């Protein structure tokens, strides 16, 4: 048995090595060599008839969430939802799966990541890729032209996930969108304000919101000499500039996508620029870009946007970044993406972006794709990358070794002597009926020490102790678990006293 266990360990390690090489896109020869080693080890292992072949695990790119993790997630959701409601949003929900043709042609090169389903009824279906396209379909179906809504739900992507960095195949998105015909840039500015409010409230670190405009990108590509047919594919290359160097992006555009080197160089002169409203004003004077109608419209709107952002007090958090491209096909105007910053390695250097935590933009043409008459409904919105935020919060709590409360129980109903189960049940029923979050131990005669230990382990702040003397006196002994202080409270006053002592918002830690 020991030899077999050792072989199983070798097979597992070799299997992980093969998977790692595939993810790193190693050479075919190297992968084949390691696969051969794996097959040789499996052959040595031979069949094990007594061992079940089924491996109990979650599918790739998914995970279970423990009560501790869910407590953190609910706290994050509460912050996000309260902000959405503060800005007047209504909530909607849509099906997890859509007709395949609803999603087709909306995501550019990312369309290959859509999960398709087989349906016995004959319909071609796909799992939703995001919450934006289903929202546009909802508007068109219901002939709505004006709504401010939020939607928090799971979406699905057939990706190669890096779960350690908060990337999955099944994950939550938290979306806020404003649909309707309004004066320019007012809804867009509010979306950026919401993004900043949420990220500041979550206290996950310094962040920067990059903004650009799809019209500026398209105008820039046009004056640089990019053929119309290559706009979107070149756009997806530029969008990688936050992850790889300009040289790598240029090599992809020239080598893989057939763009002329001199055209790529002209693009490079623009997309490596970033700044504030001064850069917008500089580009408005650019002799070539200012002659392009689309780019001029985009720059004019960005200038107005910065005026509103200054009034909202968040202009210092915003950077006009010409490399921001956002690969999705449906964006038509302003686009934005929030990244967390890590401190510079040396004095004088700029902080580095370490990952997107929110993004969004304007998509005025998406609803028209679903309307029989092509009627457009202007829309702008944002999506909070909650999975990455969850990962950051969890890592921070682990590093600080902070205890997380997994329940909101305010009080444990306990007894100091035996044969008081009926009294405990009567009291806890009174507390539940009064809206108090209460528990008791499921034993007829639990020891008082065990009841107090349970409170310390689970973070319950108060214990309501029933004893024979307390019953005679018509009082309940209320004990603070933290201070161990005990006071007698008249039974009719107990509910109000518990509410008074636990009126502070419950913390996750």
UniProtKB/Swiss-Prot annotation:
Top-level taxon of the source organism: Eukaryota
Record PANTHER family: HISTIDINE--TRNA LIGASE, CYTOPLASMIC (PTHR11476:SF8), HISTIDYL-TRNA SYNTHETASE (PTHR11476)
Function text: Catalyzes the ATP-dependent ligation of histidine to the 3'-end of its cognate tRNA, via the formation of an aminoacyl-adenylate intermediate (His-AMP). Plays a role in axon guidance.
Biological-process GO terms, alphabetical: histidyl-tRNA aminoacylation; mitochondrial translation
Location of the WHEP-TRS domain: 3-59
Pfam family membership, one: WHEP-TRS
Catalytic activity from the UniProt record: tRNA(His) + L-histidine + ATP = L-histidyl-tRNA(His) + AMP + diphosphate + H(+)
Classification via PROSITE patterns: AA_TRNA_LIGASE_II, WHEP_TRS_1, WHEP_TRS_2
Organism: Bos taurus (Bovine)
Protein name in UniProt: Histidine--tRNA ligase, cytoplasmic
Keywords assigned: Acetylation, Aminoacyl-tRNA synthetase, ATP-binding, Cytoplasm, Ligase, Nucleotide-binding, Phosphoprotein, Protein biosynthesis
Locations listed in the record: Cytoplasm
Protein family membership: Belongs to the class-II aminoacyl-tRNA synthetase family.
Enzymatic class: ligase
InterPro entries linked to this entry: aa-tRNA-synth_II (IPR006195), aa-tRNA-synth_II/BPL/LPL (IPR045864), Anticodon-bd (IPR004154), Anticodon-bd_dom_sf (IPR036621), His-tRNA-ligase (IPR015807), HisRS-like_core (IPR041715), HisRS/HisZ (IPR004516), HisRS_anticodon (IPR033656)
Organism lineage string: Eukaryota, Metazoa, Chordata, Craniata, Vertebrata
Quaternary assembly: Homodimer.
Residues reported in the UniProt entry to bind L-histidine: 130-132, 157, 173, 177, 326, 330-331
């Amino acid at each position: 048995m020991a030899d077999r266990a050792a072989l199983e360990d070798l097979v597992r390690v070799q299997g992980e090595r093969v998977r790692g090489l595939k993810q790193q896109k190693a050479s075919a020869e190297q992968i084949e060599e390691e696969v051969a080693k794996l097959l040789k080890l499996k052959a040595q292992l031979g069949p094990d008839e007594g061992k079940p072949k089924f491996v109990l695990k979650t599918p790739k790119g998914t995970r279970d969430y423990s009560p501790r993790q869910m407590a953190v997630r609910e706290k994050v959701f509460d912050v996000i939802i309260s902000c959405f409601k503060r800005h007047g949003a209504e909530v909607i929900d849509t099906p997890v799966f859509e007709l395949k043709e609803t999603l087709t042609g909306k995501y550019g090169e990312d369309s290959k990541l859509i999960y398709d389903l087989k349906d016995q009824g004959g319909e071609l279906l796909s799992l939703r890729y995001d919450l934006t396209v289903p929202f546009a379909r909802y508007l068109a179906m219901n002939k709505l032209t004006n709504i401010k809504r939020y939607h928090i739900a799971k979406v699905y992507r057939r990706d190669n996930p890096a779960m350690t960095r908060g990337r999955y195949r099944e994950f939550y998105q938290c979306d806020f969108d404003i649909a309707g015909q309004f004066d320019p840039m007012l809804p867009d500015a509010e979306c950026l304000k919401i993004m900043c409010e949420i990220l500041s409230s979550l206290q996950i670190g310094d962040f920067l919101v990059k903004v650009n405009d799809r019209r500026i990108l398209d105008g820039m590509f046009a004056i640089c000499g990019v053929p119309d047919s290559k706009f979107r594919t070149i756009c997806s290359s530029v969008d990688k500039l936050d992850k790889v160097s300009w040289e790598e992006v240029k090599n992809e555009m020239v080598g893989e996508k057939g763009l002329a080197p001199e055209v790529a160089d002209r693009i490079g002169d623009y997309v490596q620029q970033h700044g504030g409203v001064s850069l917008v004003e500089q580009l408005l004077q650019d002799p070539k870009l200012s002659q392009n109608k689309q780019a001029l419209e985009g720059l004019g709107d960005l200038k107005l946007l910065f005026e509103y952002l200054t009034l909202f007090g968040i202009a210092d958090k915003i950077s006009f970044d010409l490399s921001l491209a956002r690969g999705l096909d449906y964006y038509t105007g302003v686009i934005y993406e929030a990244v967390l910053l890590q401190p510079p390695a040396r004095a004088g250097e700029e902080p580095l972006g370490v990952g997107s935590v929110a993004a969004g933009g304007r998509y005025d043409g998406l609803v028209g794709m679903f309307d029989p008459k092509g009627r457009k409904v202007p829309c702008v919105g944002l999506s909070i990358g909650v999975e990455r935020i969850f990962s950051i919060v969890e890592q921070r709590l682990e590093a600080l070794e902070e205890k997380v409360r997994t329940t909101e129980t305010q009080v444990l109903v306990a007894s100091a002597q035996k044969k008081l189960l009926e009294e405990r049940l009567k009291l806890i029923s009174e507390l539940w009926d009064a809206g108090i979050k209460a528990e008791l131990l499921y034993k007829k005669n639990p020891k008082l020490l065990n009841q107090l230990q349970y409170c310390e382990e689970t973070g319950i702040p108060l214990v309501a102790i029933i004893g024979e003397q307390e019953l005679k006196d018509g009082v309940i002994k209320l004990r603070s678990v933290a201070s161990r202080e005990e006071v007698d409270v008249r039974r009719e006053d107990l509910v109000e006293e518990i509410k008074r002592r636990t009126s502070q918002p419950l913390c996750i830690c």
